[in-house]
């Protein structure tokens, strides 16, 4: 309880997907039964995979999750060591442009929000709430500038990250306007569903009440 959820961006459901190779025989979510599926353990893509399994009418035990970081997962995916891959941008965009995989489902298809959060230590939050407000205002301002000047934003991000400009352009296309604010009730409820699912899978040792670890700042004057 030393960490608090202090900020969140709007959902990005189009920025994550469950992929199979374009020549894969697997066509539906139900085809995942018994398959080896790469995913980063505990990530937003892990929850996407949980939702995919549920949508297919399967149990978690019906699949074989293979826990890999994105770079290792892509290598395994391309050499067919795994049958499918649950992943998010920009790795999703990079793979899409490089090898044209088939998308079995996106976060939008599966009602998986793919939220992004900002966390801070409770003592810092209590001592410096105004710093967080300034930070969120500046992040939101930067996002507005990126939305208004996409070509410039793409070049800056590509130069900084080393990603191909085409990859950056694709993932920015899928990224909605993303001002940062304190997590609201809908976002907290979304994250509670993730926490409950991860507890059920044994990824976290005990139940978590997300609302108890969300920053509740005083209203701005």
Feature map (PLM): residue ranges:
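Short, glycine-/small- and polar/acidic-enriched structural segments
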Residues: 1-59, 64-67, 83-89, 104, ...
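Secondary-structure end/capping motifs
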Residues: 126-205
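Phosphate-coordinating loops and pocket residues in cytosolic domains that bind phosphorylated ligands
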Residues: 34, 97, 215
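Short phosphate-engaging motifs
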Residues: 14, 25, 44-45, 73, ...
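Pocket-lining segment of extracytoplasmic ligand-binding domains
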Residues: 62, 66, 71-159
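Conserved C-terminal helix/tail region of periplasmic/extracytoplasmic solute-binding proteins
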Residues: 196-221
């Amino acid at each position: 309880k030393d960490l608090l959820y202090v900020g969140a961006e709007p959902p990005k459901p189009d920025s994550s997907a469950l992929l199979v190779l374009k020549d894969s025989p697997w066509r539906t979510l139900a085809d995942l039964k018994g398959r080896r599926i790469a995913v980063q353990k505990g990530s937003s893509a892990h929850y996407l995979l949980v939702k995919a399994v549920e949508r297919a009418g399967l149990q978690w035990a019906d699949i074989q999750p293979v826990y890999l970081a994105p770079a290792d997962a892509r290598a395994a995916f391309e050499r067919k060591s795994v049958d499918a891959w649950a992943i998010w941008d920009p790795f999703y965009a990079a793979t899409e442009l490089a090898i044209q995989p088939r998308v079995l489902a996106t976060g939008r298809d599966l009602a998986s929000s793919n939220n992004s959060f900002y966390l801070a230590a409770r003592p810092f939050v209590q001592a410096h709430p105004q710093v967080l407000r300034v930070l969120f205002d500046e992040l939101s301002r930067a996002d507005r500038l990126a939305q208004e000047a996409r070509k410039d934003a793409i070049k800056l991000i590509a130069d900084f990250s080393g990603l191909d400009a085409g990859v950056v352009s694709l993932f920015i296309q899928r990224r909605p306007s993303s001002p940062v604010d304190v997590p609201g009730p809908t976002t907290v409820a979304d994250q509670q569903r993730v926490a409950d699912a991860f507890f059920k899978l044994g990824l976290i040792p005990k139940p978590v009440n997300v609302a108890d670890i969300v920053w509740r700042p005083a209203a701005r004057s």
